[in-house]
């Protein structure tokens, strides 16, 4: 799967080839290519097992989120770096006790004279150890009893700022692409707010639509299926040919939809 292989150098190389930010506006360094053109490039990258993890989140969802809700200053600062493969993002949604119930996040951003003070932690932050930024969902005011989704906001957080600690989480394979990210009274500028204060819930729902959908969800299984067949070739020849055929048929059906 895409998450297992990251190469910043590879990401920069395909950025110079125009294969990142393909559908982004040209005024921000994008290429204004069609969704079909982006699909073709994405399919070839995933089918070949290319090391796409470094730029994946920035190109697939963070860039689009900034284009939709960001200020002109934020767009001009970050989008060209995404399209050139020089700026990587991590996701700052889930917390140790807030996964599916995302409205229960405890990470808090408090207003200061010059901006915000961020405190809390995020977990399962894929690629945070190599990312430059994280879009963080934080509570900026208490939720009401009637609406728990009120009082949430999103922030563009530079992960090189002081008082940010990123700890790798080792999975069953011994790899550490997941992370826990700690924010210990991190000082943010007022320009770090992404979108509108208090409207973070509606914004993050839109971002989740980008994360949880799209052809990448099934395209990334191509290399996994190939490795599965290679690993269990002998036993599959004896009794598993129908299973392999079923999996291939399902992938091809999804591809044709």
Describe every region a protein language model picked out.
Residues 107-110:
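A structural signal for short hydrophobic beta-strand segments in well-ordered beta-sheet cores
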Residues 15-86, 126-133:
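Internal helix-loop-helix
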Residues 119-165:
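A short core secondary-structure module
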Residues 18, 41-46, 137-138, 156-161, ...:
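Short Ser/Thr-interspersed hydrophobic loop/turn segments at strand-loop and sheet-helix junctions
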Residues 164-255:
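Glycine-rich beta->alpha junctions and the first turn(s) of the following alpha-helix
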Residues 85-93, 137:
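A short, Trp-centered hydrophobic/proline-enriched beta-strand micro-motif
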Residues 55, 97-100, 124-127, 145-146, ...:
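Short Gly/Pro-enriched turn/cap motifs at secondary-structure boundaries
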Residues 71, 155, 183:
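Residue-level signal for inorganic ion chemistry
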């Amino acid at each position: 799967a895409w998450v297992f292989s990251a190469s910043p150098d590879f990401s920069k190389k395909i950025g110079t080839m125009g294969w990142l930010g393909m559908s982004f506006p040209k005024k921000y360094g994008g290429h204004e290519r069609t969704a079909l053109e982006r699909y073709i490039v994405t399919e070839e990258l995933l089918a070949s097992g290319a090391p796409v993890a470094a730029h994946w989140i920035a190109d697939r969802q963070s860039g689009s989120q900034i284009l939709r809700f960001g200020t002109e200053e934020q767009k001009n600062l970050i989008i060209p770096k995404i399209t050139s493969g020089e700026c990587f993002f991590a996701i700052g949604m889930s917390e140790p006790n807030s996964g599916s119930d995302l409205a229960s996040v405890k990470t808090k951003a408090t207003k200061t004279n010059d901006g915000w003070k961020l405190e809390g932690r995020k977990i399962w932050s894929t690629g945070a150890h190599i990312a430059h930024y994280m879009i963080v969902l934080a509570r900026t005011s208490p939720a009401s009893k009637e609406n728990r989704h009120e009082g949430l906001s999103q922030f563009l957080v530079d992960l090189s700022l002081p008082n940010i600690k990123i700890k790798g989480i080792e999975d069953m394979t011994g790899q550490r692409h997941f992370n826990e990210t700690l924010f210990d009274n991190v000082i943010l500028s007022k320009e770090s707010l992404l979108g509108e204060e208090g409207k973070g819930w509606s914004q993050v729902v839109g971002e989740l639509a980008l994360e949880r959908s799209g052809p990448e969800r099934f395209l990334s299984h191509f290399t996994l299926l190939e490795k599965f067949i290679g690993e269990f070739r002998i036993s599959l020849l004896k009794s598993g040919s129908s299973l392999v055929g079923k999996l291939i048929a399902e992938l091809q059906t999804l591809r044709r939809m």
